[in-house]
From Swiss-Prot:
It comes from Sulfurimonas denitrificans (strain ATCC 33889 / DSM 1251) (Thiomicrospira denitrificans (strain ATCC 33889 / DSM 1251)). InterPro entries: Dipeptide_epimerase, Enolase-like_C_sf, Enolase-like_N, Enolase_C-like, Mandelate_racemase_C, Mandelate_racemase_N_dom. Its EC number is 5.1.1.-. This is L-amino acid-D/L-Glu epimerase. SUPFAM superfamilies: Enolase C-terminal domain-like (SSF51604), Enolase N-terminal domain-like (SSF54826). The lineage of its organism: Bacteria, Pseudomonadati, Campylobacterota, Epsilonproteobacteria, Campylobacterales. Binds 1 Mg(2+) ion per subunit.
Length: 341
């Protein structure tokens, strides 16, 4: 089975409401879809989301990156293509992820297995994802949280910004109003060390499951100090792109957990390397995503079922934020629960 053609197209999906974080705001998910065709008629599909503020890649960069390397993969097997992608291609992590996802999709077809079985999953019982509550005015965020809970969502990821008093206020309000919910707080690098400590001190009587990337990604010393003093688990996100990053954070105890995203690490094969490293060290992870298209989310969901012993939290809620639920998924969402079709 050899690769004979690679095509790309730009896609956009409208969201129910604007998605707001400390880093960006958007009303649509924009991504590049990649189709890789083999000589036996099999087609592998991958996607790359445009999240320039995090990965440095916009739609144009993703398209030109893929175009610059696609001829390298023609007439190669998918195994050969994966090897070439990760050893010979100096392109961004999201562009790389789109090709990696497509190649792995083809390998699962060649093996005649659904993706979760190809990854080694044996337990198909439901998983649970969080849902994101976008950064907004406190009353809007509280209303959004209540609405999410009424729709069966009981794991809430609260996006907060640099205004630490607003963050303290809204997290307390949501936790008080919705005591049945698990609360995850995501600062997206917006806080200083001092404000992070202030937030933690103000959460002594508020049950929080984790704080995600409170300080800027390069500040691993600060992140480590916060992890040491915090009674709330600390999750590293933007600080961890590659296996090398993950090893450093885990081995130097800079955080209690790491967030693995296909768009950060360069695809599903690289995510597996990080998950295997974490599994061998009994270190828990979140499997997360950017705002992404349905095929890349679908791939991550399959992976989540295979590594449920390592993955403490699933943050793959993009389809729940779309204006319309996509038909491309191999899973069904029932509130927070995710089940294979």
């Amino acid at each position: 089975m050899k690769i004979v053609n690679i095509t790309t197209q730009v896609e956009s999906i409208e969201l129910k409401t604007p998605f707001k974080t400390a880093l960006r705001q958007t009303s649509h998910v924009e991504f590049v879809r990649v189709e890789v065709e083999c000589d036996n008629g099999f087609v592998g599909i991958g996607e790359a989301s445009a999240t320039k503020v995090i990965t440095g890649e916009d739609i144009y960069i993703i398209l030109t990156s893929i175009a610059s390397v696609e001829e390298l993969f023609l007439n190669l097997t998918c195994e050969e293509a994966l090897g070439a992608l990760h050893t010979k291609c100096a392109i961004g992590s999201s562009a790389k992820a789109s090709l990696d996802i497509a190649f792995v999709h083809l390998l699962s077809q060649e093996a005649k297995k659904p993706l979760y079985e190809y990854f080694g999953a044996t337990d198909k019982s439901a998983l649970k994802s969080d849902i994101t509550i976008s950064l907004n005015e406190a009353d809007v965020m509280l209303n959004d949280a209540k609405k999410a809970f009424s729709n069966g969502m009981d794991i809430l990821k609260i996006k907060v910004g640099s205004d630490i008093l607003h963050a303290i206020d809204i997290v307390r309000k949501i936790a008080k109003e919705l005591p049945e919910c698990d609360i995850l707080v995501d600062a997206n690098q917006a806080w200083s060390f001092e404000n992070t400590v202030l937030f933690i001190e103000n959460m002594l009587n508020t049950p929080i499951k984790l704080i995600e990337q409170p300080v800027e990604a390069p500040n691993l010393d600060g992140l480590k100090k916060i992890t040491e003093l915090s009674h709330i688990p600390i999750l590293a996100d933007e600080a961890v792109f590659t296996l090398k990053d993950a090893k450093k954070v885990i081995e130097e105890k800079c955080a209690d957990m790491i967030n693995i995203k296909l768009m950060k690490c360069g695809g599903v094969s690289k995510a597996i390397e990080i998950l295997e490293f974490a599994r061998n060290r009994e270190f828990k992870c979140m499997l997360g995503s950017m705002l992404e298209g349905p095929y890349s989310i679908n791939m991550a969901l399959h992976l989540a079922f295979a590594y449920r012993d390592v993955i403490e939290f699933v943050d793959l809620d993009s389809p729940l934020l779309y204006k319309e639920m996509p038909k491309e998924l191999d899973f069904v969402f029932d509130g927070c629960e995710i089940k294979p079709l």
